[in-house]
Amino acid sequence: MKLSTSLLAIVAVASTFIGNALSATTVPGCFAECIDKAAVAVNCAAGDIDCLQASSQFATIVSECVATSDCTALSPGSASDADSINKTFNILSGLGFIDEADAFSAADVPEERDLTGLGRVLPVEKRQNCPTRRGLCVTSGLTACRNHCRSCHRGDVGCVRCSNAQCTGFLGTTCTCINPCPRC
């Protein structure tokens, strides 16, 4: 059975409910360990994308591991974290869930989001649109994601009402600003 987008979405769902609580576990190290454990469980090498895609259990095992290991925070700076980040992104890009160029780019990717329904009240031109940042949650953690969103709101139109942020997408790798800030 081919590894489908809906099956892999299970992993994404588990990683998006990270809330405000942070643990000492490193995100890339934790995710990489879960990927390794799941690969062994389905008799695949962690880098064998074709084998992982063919497995019907890989995403379920990774999802359960992410949930039970509390893969929600980053302790940045160690060489093993850098190796784990590379390994995790290689797996995710190999499975087609992230574009390697986007993941390793520092450039913002503009994306209009209306998660609060302000579009019904205020026209788009009256709202500030903050770009998502791919890979930021893994490389720098939820705190950096929140800082990115606050900086976006303050820098674009001088708005001081800080928006919240969350790590979304597959394995929570994308920083998404929520609660769009009306122009001040």
From Swiss-Prot:
Any one Gene Ontology molecular-function term assigned to this protein's record: lipid binding
Reported effect, residue 168 to G: No change in activity against S.aureus, but increase in activity against B.subtilis
Propeptide residues, chain positions: 24-127
Disulfide-bonded cysteines: 130-159, 137-167, 145-175, 149-177, 152-184, 162-181
GO terms for cellular component: extracellular region; membrane; other organism cell membrane
Organism, scientific name: Coprinopsis cinerea
Name of the protein in question: Fungal defensin copsin
pH dependence: Optimum pH is 1-8.
UniProt-reported outcome of changing residue 140 to H: Increase in antibacterial activity against both B.subtilis and S.aureus
Signal peptide: 1-23
Thermal characteristics: Optimum temperature is 4-90 degrees Celsius.
Family stated for the protein in its record: Belongs to the invertebrate defensin family.
Positions bearing Pyrrolidone carboxylic acid: 128
Source domain of life: Eukaryota
Keywords carried by this UniProt record: Antibiotic, Antimicrobial, Cleavage on pair of basic residues, Defensin, Disulfide bond, Lipid-binding, Membrane, Pyrrolidone carboxylic acid, Secreted, Signal, Target cell membrane, Target membrane
